[in-house]
């Protein structure tokens, strides 16, 4: 159903790490991606019933983490510290072999 809307995007922030990632048009952010430091993050969506105030969606937090984090530990800390809208299961891996599964 969403396959026609998947787009591969190359990100080249001025002050950050380059990344390749999939996005679902027209949603902002990254669903799955890997940056130049070999940090990889993938999202499995989850149904959420929370009624929270509008915040950045999870995919925006993933894109931001890929641009600014080199390790799983950095990415988990950054993503968990920020308010967000939505839920999901994140899988993260980095060049050192560190792995994490995070439920949002």
Show which residues each predicted segment covers:
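N-terminal nucleophile
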Residues: 1-104
């Amino acid at each position: 159903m969403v396959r026609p809307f998947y787009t591969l995007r190359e990100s080249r922030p001025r002050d950050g790490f380059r990344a390749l990632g999939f996005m679902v048009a027209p949603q902002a952010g990254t669903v799955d991606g890997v940056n130049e430091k070999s940090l990889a993050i993938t999202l499995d969506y989850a149904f959420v019933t929370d009624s929270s105030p509008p915040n950045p969606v999870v995919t925006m937090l993933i894109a931001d983490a890929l641009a600014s984090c080199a390790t799983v530990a950095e990415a988990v800390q950054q993503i968990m510290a920020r308010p967000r809208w939505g839920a999901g299961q994140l899988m993260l891996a980095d060049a050192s072999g560190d792995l994490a599964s995070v439920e949002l």
